[in-house]
Each structure stands twice: as structure tokens, then as C-alpha cells.
């Protein structure tokens, strides 16, 4: 896996189109409605000005999850519901929801295994200098000096 330039949300040029929250929400409904699920509005746990992603809460008959969409690249993942004060995303696999998002042809759906994989130097070949600087800084603060792919794609570093 190669992390594309600007996936971190740092150094994105002004005027660069971000993902559209309305389209994302509509796609969430399109995917969960056939499964007797719904999309719920919840107070934001994280300040969206400082995140590289947008969220939607998906309520399914057997569980609740948060869908995460990177603001720059249409990379999608899922985690347990976000809690105030929480600083670690707990990624999950979510089929058939993930497959349904992939079938829309607009998203790259990342599995839990991909999201939890440690970031390696070779994955960072396309990242910009500012992004690499941020990774170096946050890696020092991370538990055991390890940053996961999901921490880069869906970050709330300020």
C-alpha cells in the first residue's frame, strides 16, 4: 500500500475539493437502508476543523459503527463509535456494508487489517515533506513509536 500525497490532510492547497458531506451521508443511507439500518445525527465528538476525515454514525440491527471518510481521498474505513476524550480509533471490519460501499465505485474501502498495519517508510514514498514531518513528530508521541495506516488516513492531529 502506498499512501497518496495529502492523505494526511496537511498542506492541501486552498480551493482543493474536499469530500462532500451530503453525498457521503446519502451514500451511507443508500448502503444501510436495505439492511434495516439508519444514519444518525450525533453531536461531533471531534472538532472537524482538526480532522482529516468526516464521520457518519451507522446504526444497524446488531450494532453501531462510525463510518470514516478521508476528506481528500475517497478512502473509507469503519471504527467503533467515537467517545468524547477518546484518542484511539478502534477499527472494525463491516460486511456487507463495506462491500456495498465498494460497489458504488466511489470509495476505496480499507479493511481493519489494512488500517491497523504499521506505517513503513516504503508506504510514505508519495507523501510531501510537511506530511513526513508530521509523521515523524507524531510517531515520537505514539505508543511504542508506531503509527498505524488508519492513524494517518483518519487523523485528528492539530
Name these PLM-found stretches.
Residues 1-118:
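Extended, charge-biased low-complexity segments
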Residues 110-158:
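Acidic, proline/glycine-rich low-complexity IDRs
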Amino acid at each position: 500500500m502506498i499512501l497518496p500525497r495529502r492523505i494526511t490532510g496537511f498542506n492541501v492547497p486552498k480551493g482543493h475539493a474536499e469530500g462532500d458531506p451530503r453525498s457521503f451521508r446519502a451514500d451511507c443511507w443508500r448502503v444501510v437502508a436495505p439492511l434495516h439500518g439508519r444514519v444518525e445525527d450525533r453531536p461531533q465528538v471531534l472538532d472537524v476543523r482538526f480532522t482529516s476525515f468526516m464521520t457518519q454514525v451507522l446504526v444497524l440491527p446488531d450494532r453501531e459503527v462510525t463510518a470514516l471518510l478521508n476528506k481528500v481521498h475517497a478512502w473509507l474505513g469503519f471504527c467503533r463509535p467515537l467517545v468524547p476524550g477518546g484518542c484511539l480509533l478502534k477499527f472494525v471490519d463491516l460486511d456487507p456494508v463495506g462491500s456495498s460501499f465498494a460497489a458504488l465505485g466511489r470509495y476505496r474501502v480499507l479493511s481493519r487489517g489494512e488500517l491497523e498495519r504499521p506505517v513503513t517508510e516504503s508506504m510514505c514514498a508519495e507523501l510531501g515533506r510537511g506530511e513526513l514531518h508530521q509523521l515523524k513528530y507524531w510517531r515520537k508521541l505514539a505508543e511504542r513509536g508506531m503509527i498505524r495506516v488508519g492513524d494517518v488516513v483518519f487523523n485528528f492531529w492539530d
